[in-house]
């Protein structure tokens, strides 16, 4: 008899806990409606399938249509469906398994856009990166045991703790499948040009056809997170930890997820409020290096107004010839910032018995090494990725105009060396040291991060900096060197974050392509930003709706508490 009574009390506590959990879910589901303006709610209702209501369940086909995900991309659809499924259960991210409704899609929008999430959760330190990683790592189709016991769930005072602990999530245990992340990032990169504004029109067919092209740049980002991944096939059996994910995004790709935020807010606009992205004309005359997909990778760390407007081709070695003279004639008239691109194939001579097999075959390379001073074998510490992937791509952002500098240096603290392939890394100029670039027309070539070479009748000698990129005067060979701190450039951001700034290595490579592209001046870029801001403000203006003509949508507004009784609508 006593056992029966005890069991009844236990069941009662469990049911009470479940009820309180459901009440919390209902509270946040209803709260999400109050975070949106009248126009946003009406627009969203207009975007869901005809005849469907906010509390109806969402099908995969709805996700495909509303978020421009190709119907034949099973991996991408699965990733997004799981993401929405996880967010639908906020704040009980791990303890609840409710299905996705159209109302919870609105909740997902709030949770993935940081500015909205801070208001929605009433938490200034809300971390949208953590929330996204949870949605990518948890599998909501696999029901697990609740992480929190009934006593914790039944204590109303602990709800703030539930939210701020992300429902007791242990981030050290979370991992994202690298293949899922590869597909996810390919879509995000492809969207970077389409979603430069929240209300840009998106061509689904064009987006679907271009996704394969963006997988190569997505792979560079994935390898940045996990250097043990070499090829796309490696992604199938590899994973990414939260530390790897967050370090890569925060340190070298801070703009990576901006297109996702734009996409999430895209559903808050009616078709009539969308604008043609005339500001985003396809890049004219793309080259082997600079094309739509490469621009998307640049946009992960450079401001969008630099990458997606007034990007002007100045010099392409394949077209104008690989010479300092051609470079000078094409580039030196540009009085605004530029980006120098250098692509090549790494020379694998570190494993040779004598370290000079290629030098024996190529006397020009042998002479270059004698002038430069090859890093000693015992100081060459290349990881597996660097050894197996020969292709290298560097970009150098320079604010100062180019000029002949046979004695002095130019370039200020904004100069950056960026590695784009096979991984992404950023090397910042030391703000306390002046001058970091030379363009030497008497045989010294181009140097970033080095002192001027000494050139005499009987030869020359380079003085590479601790972190530097050197290009010989024939634009045939290049060397990127990394010895740590002490030069005019700092060690890589990720390298430093991982505590590996003292690791020494260098990439010696045969140059295949050299390009220089001009960016707009500050005045032009400011005008572009103002134009985009005007476009978004204009969309908001057009979005205003006459509430008296809403008819059937009035019930939706009453549900959100925007109209009804003594209210007349408006935003919360």
From Swiss-Prot:
TLDc domain span: 288-520
Superkingdom, taxonomy of origin: Eukaryota
InterPro entries in alphabetical order: TLDc_dom
Family annotation (PROSITE patterns): TLDC
Signal peptide: none
Name of the protein: Restriction of telomere capping protein 5
One GO cellular component term: cytoplasm
Family membership: Belongs to the RTC5 family.
Classification of source organism: Eukaryota, Fungi, Dikarya, Ascomycota, Saccharomycotina
Subcellular location as annotated: Cytoplasm
Primary site of residence: cytoplasm
Role summary: May be involved in a process influencing telomere capping.
Keywords attached to this entry: Cytoplasm
Record-linked Pfam families: TLD (PF07534)
